[in-house]
Amino acid sequence: MSPSIWEKCLKYLQNKLSPIEFSMWIRPLKAEFKKNILILYAPNEFSFNWIKDNYIENLKKLLKNFCNINTTPTLMLKICKPKIIQKKFFNELTLKKNILNSKLTYNVNTKLSNIIYSSEINTNYTFQNFTKGQSNQLAFKTIYKIAHNPGKNYFNPLFLYGKSGLGKTHLLHAVANTILKYKNTIKIIYINSENFIQNMITSLKNNTIEEFKKYYRSVNTLLIDDIQFFAYKKHSQEELFHTINALLNRNQQIIITSDQFPQKIHGIETRLKSRFECGLTIRIDPPDLNTRTKILIKKSHIYDINLSYKVAFFIAKNLKSNIRELEGALNKILANSDSKKKIITINFAYKTLQELFSLPKKSITIKNIQKVVSNYYHITIINLLSQCRLKSIVKPRQIAMAISKKLTNKSLSEIGREFNGRNHATVLYACKKIKKLQEKNNNIKKDFLTLLKILSS
């Protein structure tokens, strides 16, 4: 018997059974061939007994259908031993992703009994590559704490909400990956709400709703993304409500995300909203300028794009919506550059991304100029306005004054007052100084023009 026969069996069963039933009972089986014997290894005793009572006879019939009567192998069922994971099994041959409704990810150190629970988890999303900032600091600290001690705190369920593209899904996957790495005896599921609903519908059609319930209520950590998709789906909400209750009664961790605060989600039952809010609710806001700049720098390293801080700052100043918008900008830069190693300039970024930039101009204030210049030079506004005479502070201060003169209608005296009560002579000196420096120093000229472009865009 060739290994392809077992592959055919798997594909047949995958089309015949519900996604939950297949993922829960069939896919974890490991196959080994010895002479004319097919040995199936169940991951644990519970699975062994269930397969023996419910599937073994059908599996024997299926083998006969795919084999000649004289070549049908003897079928044996055993409980998997730890060393079996090191062997190359035939049913680990790649099944096409478009056939699978649920992607199962695990590593060689993960116990077999947990493999079926780690569905849809993206291993690329970790805490290490998540960019922290003021807008997501509380969410990050809380979820990081939960990941290292799930179900052992008062943050249950944890409800994260915010607009699309702010990192909620990234944090859910980071939790899952951390738990699988450090607590691989814990059973964990990440699932998008639409997939949960679809799995439930399929289970109802195939009369396997009890398996569906056992699957979701037997986990230790449940991560549900985009809960707003349950709106106006009465039966799905009913099942979700009982699933949440079952897990909370066992002190199992639940983390939920949404694009809105629980009470503002239309079409969700009041009792379910109450469950969402009985733990801790945290809002994630759009990233601020510094965080957006850090995100671009970090992503540029991943994309292998030669992006300087000043160019990243320029892009971040003009793209303010969400992280996906920033990633889209980098993709566009990469697509339009001659090579990955090309040095990206402000002008190149502007020409490439001008369609993405927020074009409506806002009135420019001196306070806004002070903020942008301070961020650009990595100094605080307090230092910018202080009496400090360090060159690293004086030059940004003078540039800020010169830009204020150029971009606002304020008098020299009015500008001076905004700079901690300085007089008009100080501002005039700063403007003349920066003008002369631009003629001699290309770096000063470049900084001045870059800041003008940032503030004018």
From Swiss-Prot:
Disulfide bonds: none annotated. Residues 1-71 are annotated as: Domain I, interacts with DnaA modulators. GO terms for biological process: DNA replication initiation; regulation of DNA replication. Residues 338-457 are annotated as: Domain IV, binds dsDNA. One of its GO terms (cellular component) is plasma membrane. Transmembrane segments: none annotated. The keyword Glycoprotein does not apply. It is found in: Cytoplasm. Residues 71-119 are annotated as: Domain II. Residues 120-337 are annotated as: Domain III, AAA+ region. Keywords: ATP-binding, Cytoplasm, DNA replication, DNA-binding, Lipid-binding, Nucleotide-binding. It holds the Pfam family Bac_DnaA_C. PROSITE patterns: DNAA (PS01008). GO terms for molecular function: ATP binding; ATP hydrolysis activity; DNA replication origin binding; lipid binding. InterPro entries: AAA+_ATPase, Chromosome_initiator_DnaA, Chromosome_initiator_DnaA-like, Chromosome_initiator_DnaA_CS, DnaA_C, DnaA_dom, DnaA_N_dom, DnaA_N_sf. Plays an essential role in the initiation and regulation of chromosomal replication. ATP-DnaA binds to the origin of replication (oriC) to initiate formation of the DNA replication initiation complex once per cell cycle. Binds the DnaA box (a 9 base pair repeat at the origin) and separates the double-stranded (ds)DNA. Forms a right-handed helical filament on oriC DNA; dsDNA binds to the exterior of the filament while single-stranded (ss)DNA is stabiized in the filament's interior. Domain I is involved in oligomerization and binding regulators, domain II is flexibile and of varying length in different bacteria, domain III forms the AAA+ region, while domain IV binds dsDNA. Belongs to the DnaA family. This is Chromosomal replication initiator protein DnaA. The gene is dnaA.
